[in-house]
């Protein structure tokens, strides 16, 4: 059936009978709104009766009929223009002695099915002309039927209340058509705008217009509020779950949010063996792309080839080019800002101390501020390494996506990290951080991308050096604490091998014996916050096969955790400490050889570079270091 609308002309009366009554629920019109074409006022209808016309859908419409005109006969079937049949029923309305019939604008009329419709008088020009259907009645009268939207009787109730509260409503299982919701909201907004005076009991916008609300209550659904403020984008849809109270701008967003309380995930992945379910269709669509590999959202920035599964991921990535950080920390005196709201949320926990993710492994007891760090930590216990390098012949596996992404750069010449000060690009985020500290005095931490696109060029990769091998195996980062321990060292068939190893073995770096001889054995570890941790040369000297444990020393001289250096038949790698002089310069530990030379790494061990300026790759840095030590002068980009 069609949505009723309450309208009036400038002369129309706006008071409903019983104006002082309590706020009431009014079932929305079950009849079609009929406007008489001649526009006669409904007052002083001497000798006039209402003619009930039963439409084909079973609803009843009342039309004005002069009793002197006998063209309409009780029980007569009228063929309407759309081909449907209407049945005429004559309903005489008795008059009080000496009084004329007064049907006031806005008056409630009780229909035969027990529902209530409102009499209204208005010009048809006030309606959307595309929604009006002209019906020629047999008495020559033209009536206009206003088609708004089909509203099922059992599903929809319009509750209009001045106090903005709803009580005594029964929930139902019916699903409401979004078009119905939209029509109801538009209707309430129209009444809010058109109404200038009204009785408080009806909840129409009246004298205290700014203080009143109009609520649209759908059975089985949360309260929806429509008022003038709604048009300006105010968050008017409130979550009614205990302790929540979050506000949303649309009913749809509220409904999606409520699934976080109910656990409802109606959208299930149909990919064989998957079975994951999601709260939104968009979430499912994005997930399916992990199976298909589709990444339709491509960055348009020059020299950037990244693509993403969702437009949201692309938007986050674009901020790495623009430097935009729209999400500011709310704590006074902090001043940090972030590219995503989720990163800000995790950051805020550094102020509050909240760590809601607890490891359930017996005897562990660790807790984390972010779900990502928690999941990565759990994989230490399970041994799971779900992220596999897809470059042919590599097959390295990683516990976290970011480690896989960082690993990818060893196979290509991609430099995904750019300096927002000067525009220089780098393969490793740690090298970018070091550049910003040394060149621009910028100590602001850099957010690492959790999702990024990488597509290695076909057949392209770094050449693997022959000969002895140094393997640096990365550690696992869990929040701000890094666990660096000795793992297993295996013989790879090479005659000489050095392994600097920590708990989560992943990244391998190949190096020739000539390069090892040129490099020496001084290593500086640089933590994520820029603090240099030096492994002293006299402790790091390897003179024979065996394992040597040395303590990492902070810049202030405080001893830290133990790092193991394992050597096998490395007499050629030995350099006596007496033959090397060292001096501390800025963040670099340099030798007194021809050129300054330092190996550096982040505290979680995911990147190593030679500090010869700004080297992006460990293998490239080692090659350049070797050539410099041998008297050559290669450029940084060689």
UniProtKB/Swiss-Prot annotation:
Please list the coiled coil stretches.
none
- Give a GO cellular-component term: nucleoplasm
Chain positions found as Phosphothreonine: 352
What keywords were assigned to this record?
Answer: Acetylation, Activator, DNA-binding, Isopeptide bond, Metal-binding, Nucleus, Phosphoprotein, Repeat, Transcription, Transcription regulation, Ubl conjugation, Zinc, Zinc-finger
What subcellular locations does the record give?
Nucleus
Give residue ranges of zinc fingers (C2H2-type).
237-261, 267-291, 297-321, 327-351, 357-381, 387-411, 417-440
Name the Pfam families for this protein.
zf-C2H2
Q: In which tissues is it expressed?
A: Expressed in all tissues tested, with the strongest expression in ovary.
The keyword Amino-acid biosynthesis is annotated on this UniProt entry: no
Please name the GO terms that the record assigns under molecular function: DNA-binding transcription activator activity, RNA polymerase II-specific; DNA-binding transcription factor activity, RNA polymerase II-specific; RNA polymerase II cis-regulatory region sequence-specific DNA binding; zinc ion binding
Where is the cross-link described as Glycyl lysine isopeptide (Lys-Gly) (interchain with G-Cter in SUMO2)?
A: 213, 406
BP terms from Gene Ontology: positive regulation of snRNA transcription by RNA polymerase II; positive regulation of transcription by RNA polymerase II; positive regulation of transcription by RNA polymerase III; regulation of DNA-templated transcription; regulation of transcription by RNA polymerase II; regulation of transcription by RNA polymerase III
Q: Which residues carry this modification: N-acetylmethionine?
A: 1
PROSITE patterns listed in its UniProt record? ZINC_FINGER_C2H2_1, ZINC_FINGER_C2H2_2
InterPro entries, A to Z? Znf_C2H2_sf, Znf_C2H2_type
Its principal location?
nucleus
Query: What is this protein's function?
Result: Transcriptional activator. Activates the gene for selenocysteine tRNA (tRNAsec). Binds to the SPH motif of small nuclear RNA (snRNA) gene promoters. Participates in efficient U6 RNA polymerase III transcription via its interaction with CHD8. In complex with HCFC1 and ZNF143, regulates the expression of several genes, including AP2S1, ESCO2, OPHN1, RBL1, UBXN8 and ZNF32.
Would you identify the family this protein belongs to, as annotated?
Answer: Belongs to the GLI C2H2-type zinc-finger protein family.
Q: How does it assemble?
A: Interacts with CHD8. Forms a complex with HCFC1 and ZNF143.
Instruction: Tell me the protein's name.
Output: Zinc finger protein 143
What gene is behind this protein? ZNF143
């Amino acid at each position: 059936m069609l949505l009723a609308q309450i309208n009036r002309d400038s002369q129309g009366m706006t008071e409903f009978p019983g104006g002082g009554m309590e706020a009431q629920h009014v079932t929305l019109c079950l009849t079609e709104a009929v406007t008489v074409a001649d526009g006669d006022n409904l007052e002083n209808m001497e000798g006039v009766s209402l003619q009930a016309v039963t439409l084909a859908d079973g609803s009843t419409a009342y039309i004005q009929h002069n009793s002197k005109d006998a063209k309409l006969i009780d029980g007569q079937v009228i063929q309407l223009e759309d081909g449907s049949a209407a049945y005429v029923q004559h309903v005489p309305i008795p008059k009080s002695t000496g009084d004329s019939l007064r049907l006031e604008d806005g008056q409630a009329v009780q229909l035969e099915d027990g529902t209530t419709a409102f009499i209204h008088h208005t010009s048809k020009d006030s309606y959307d002309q595309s929604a009006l259907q002209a019906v020629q009645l047999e008495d020559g009268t033209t009536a206009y039927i206003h088609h708004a939207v089909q509203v099922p009787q059992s599903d929809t109730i319009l509750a209009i209340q001045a106090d903005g509260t709803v009580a005594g409503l029964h929930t139902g299982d019916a699903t409401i058509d979004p078009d119905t919701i939209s029509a109801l909201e538009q209707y309430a907004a129209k009444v809010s705008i058109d109404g200038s005076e009204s009785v408080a009991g009806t909840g129409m916008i009246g004298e205290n217009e700014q203080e009143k609300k109009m609520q649209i209550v759908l059975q089985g659904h949360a309260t929806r509020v429509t008022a003038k403020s709604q048009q300006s984008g105010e968050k008017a849809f409130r979550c009614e779950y205990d302790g929540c109270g979050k506000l949303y701008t649309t009913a749809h967003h509220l409904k999606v949010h409520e699934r976080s309380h109910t656990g409802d995930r109606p959208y299930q992945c149909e990919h064989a063996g998957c079975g994951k379910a999601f709260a939104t269709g968009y979430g499912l669509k994005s997930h399916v792309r992990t199976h298909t590999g589709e990444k339709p959202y491509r960055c348009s920035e020059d020299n950037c080839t990244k693509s993403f599964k969702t437009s949201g991921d692309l938007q986050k990535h674009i901020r790495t080019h623009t430097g935009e950080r729209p999400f500011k920390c709310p704590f006074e005196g902090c001043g940090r800002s972030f590219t995503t709201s989720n990163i800000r949320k995790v950051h805020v926990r550094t102020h509050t101390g909240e760590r809601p993710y607890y490891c359930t492994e017996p005897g562990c007891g660790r807790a984390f501020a972010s779900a990502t760090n928690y999941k990565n930590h759990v994989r230490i216990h399970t041994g799971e390494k779900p992220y596999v390098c897809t470059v042919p012949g590599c097959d390295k596996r990683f516990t976290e996506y970011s480690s896989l992404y960082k690993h990818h750069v060893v196979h290509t010449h991609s430099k995904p990290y750019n300096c927002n000060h000067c525009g220089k690009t780098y393969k490793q985020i740690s090298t970018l951080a070091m550049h910003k500290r040394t060149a621009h005095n910028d100590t602001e931490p850099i957010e690492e991308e959790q999702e990024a696109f990488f597509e290695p060029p076909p057949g392209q990769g770094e050449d693997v050096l022959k000969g002895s091998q140094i393997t640096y195996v990365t550690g696992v980062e869990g929040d701000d604490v890094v666990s660096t321990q000795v793992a297993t060292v295996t013989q790879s068939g090479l005659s000489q091998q050095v392994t600097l190893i920590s708990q989560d073995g992943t990244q391998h770096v190949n190096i020739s014996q000539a390069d090892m001889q040129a490099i020496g054995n001084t290593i500086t570890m640089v933590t994520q916050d820029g603090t240099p941790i030096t492994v002293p040369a006299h402790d790091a000297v390897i003179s024979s096969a065996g394992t040597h444990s040395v303590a990492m020393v902070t810049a202030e001289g405080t001893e830290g955790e133990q790092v193991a250096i394992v050597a096998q038949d490395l007499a050629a790698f030995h350099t006596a400490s007496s033959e090397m002089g060292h001096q501390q310069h800025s963040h670099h530990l340099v030798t007194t050889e021809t050129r300054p030379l330092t190996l550096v790494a982040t505290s979680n061990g995911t990147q190593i570079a030679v500090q010869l300026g700004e080297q992006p790759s460990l293998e490239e840095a080692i090659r350049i270091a070797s050539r410099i030590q041998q008297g050559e002068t290669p450029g940084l980009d060689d």
